[in-house]
């Protein structure tokens, strides 16, 4: 069983927004189903978590937006001429833009520099979110969704991408590599993709890095396309469980 700990409300929100962004990106390209999309982030149980931690109203609204995708899909059964695919695509684009613009707010600037998924809590003065993955497979899938969200975010940072990308590699990818220890070939391959992303210092290096990150996002999305939906059910304890305190379940 794999376990992660995220400390502090801002870091918890930052993580949830990244997972929400990654889920939206994978769903937009039809590489995960609506059911998987909802179980990853856009579910009433996530509202319970947000309320429990008294997280931001904006994050709450983003989750409700994602839950609204089901209404668009259902409308296709009721209205013969309803162009539900165009409406759905626009709704997902809107959702992604909300996630990205929220992540760019000043309150999350410190998260870009300091965020880590592998905290060791040493104080009760801040909130902690404990995440238990029942299998290495579920850990692998959620990490891929998180990395997909982070990759999309880095691309949108444009000229400010380089420093944020270096921090992402230092604070997150290095720790993930140590935890994975080659156990998952899929994660190892993804980490190699990030390692080979060129961040030289010539005048086109920033643009070249963004293009490489776009290629990585395509590879990450493609991974989910090859999975069976039954292997990505996060509405049960077969996948992951969130805790407010160790061994105290608040969401699964």
Segments from the language model and where they lie:
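Acidic, Ser/Pro/Thr-rich low-complexity regulatory regions
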Residues: 1-252
């Amino acid at each position: 069983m794999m376990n992660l700990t995220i400390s502090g409300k801002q870091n918890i929100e930052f993580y949830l927004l990244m997972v929400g962004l990654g889920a939206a990106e994978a769903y937009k390209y039809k590489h995960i189903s609506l059911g998987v999309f909802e179980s990853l982030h856009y579910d009433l149980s996530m509202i319970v978590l947000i309320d429990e931690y008294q997280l931001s109203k904006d994050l709450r609204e983003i989750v409700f937006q994602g839950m609204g995708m089901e209404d668009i899909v259902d409308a296709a059964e009721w209205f013969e001429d309803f162009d539900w695919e165009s409406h759905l695509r626009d709704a997902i684009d809107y959702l992604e833009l909300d996630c990205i613009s929220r992540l760019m707010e000043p309150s999350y600037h410190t998260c870009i520099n300091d965020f880590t998924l592998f905290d060791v809590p040493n104080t009760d003065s801040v909130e902690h979110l404990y995440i238990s993955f029942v299998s290495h497979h579920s850990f692998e899938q959620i990490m891929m969704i998180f990395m997909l969200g982070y990759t999309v975010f880095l691309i949108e940072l444009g000229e400010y991408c380089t420093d944020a990308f270096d921090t992402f590699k230092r604070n997150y990818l290095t720790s993930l590599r140590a935890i994975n220890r080659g156990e998952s070939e899929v994660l190892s391959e993804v980490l190699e993709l990030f390692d080979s992303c060129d961040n030289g210092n010539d005048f086109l290096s920033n643009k070249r890095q963004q293009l490489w990150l776009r290629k990585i996002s395509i590879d990450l999305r493609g991974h989910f396309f090859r999975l069976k939906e039954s292997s990505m059910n996060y509405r049960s304890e077969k996948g992951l469980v969130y805790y407010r305190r160790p061994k105290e379940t608040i969401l699964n």
